[in-house]
Amino acid sequence: MKWRHDYMAEKKVEDLEMDLNEEELEESEVNEDKEFEELDKSEEENEVEELISTLKDENEKLNNEMEALKDRLLRTTGEYDNYRKRTDREKEGLYASACEDVLKEILPVLDNLERAILAKGDIEDLKKGVDMTLKQFKDSFKNLGVEEISTENGFDPNLHDAVMHVEDSQYGEKEVVEVFLKGYKKGDKIIRHSMVKVAN
């Protein structure tokens, strides 16, 4: 019996050792799992920190680019405003200069008309004065680059306004029969179309 008792005791010791080994093994596995979890957490934390750092750098870079673009936009807007103001002043100056040039040409004609009204004399003297004033007007127009629109080459809808049409065998088709109001142009720009009567 002793033998059996020793066997049982030995078996119990083996079972206890086995239980202890299993517990140690489980504890070791749990510790390893904890270490792996800590390693995983540590690696994840490092990755997250790197990602946060990268995103912060990119955000700072984008903010710098945005500030540079804002500054560029403000400068461009300011330059455009200055350009617009400068061109407005130049236009006003050109307009004033053009008006001044026209007035300088026309004022002497006005002076002569006033003198003609004040002059004492007969009809022939008055007619001679009006003819001279008319010549002076035409010279002023010539100096300003303004010329009368010709009707010698026939009717041209780009230059003439046909206010009347006539059937007359003495005139060719589209020939200007009569000028009611002379037209004028400066270069290629029409100031006023000639008002004419045209043959059909």
From Swiss-Prot:
Primary location: cytoplasm
Keywords on record: Chaperone, Cytoplasm, Stress response
Subcellular location: Cytoplasm
One Gene Ontology MF term: protein homodimerization activity
GO cellular component labels: cytoplasm
Residue ranges crossing the lipid bilayer per the database entry: none
Keyword Chaperone tagged: yes
UniProt region (Disordered), positions on chain: 15-47
Acidic residues composition-biased segments: 16-47
GO annotation, biological process: protein folding
UniProt xrefs under Pfam families: GrpE
Family: Belongs to the GrpE family.
NCBIfam families: PRK14140.1, PRK14160.1
Assembly description: Homodimer.
Record's function text: Participates actively in the response to hyperosmotic and heat shock by preventing the aggregation of stress-denatured proteins, in association with DnaK and GrpE. It is the nucleotide exchange factor for DnaK and may function as a thermosensor. Unfolded proteins bind initially to DnaJ; upon interaction with the DnaJ-bound protein, DnaK hydrolyzes its bound ATP, resulting in the formation of a stable complex. GrpE releases ADP from DnaK; ATP binding to DnaK triggers the release of the substrate protein, thus completing the reaction cycle.
Protein name as it appears in the record: Protein GrpE
Protein's organism: Clostridium tetani (strain Massachusetts / E88)
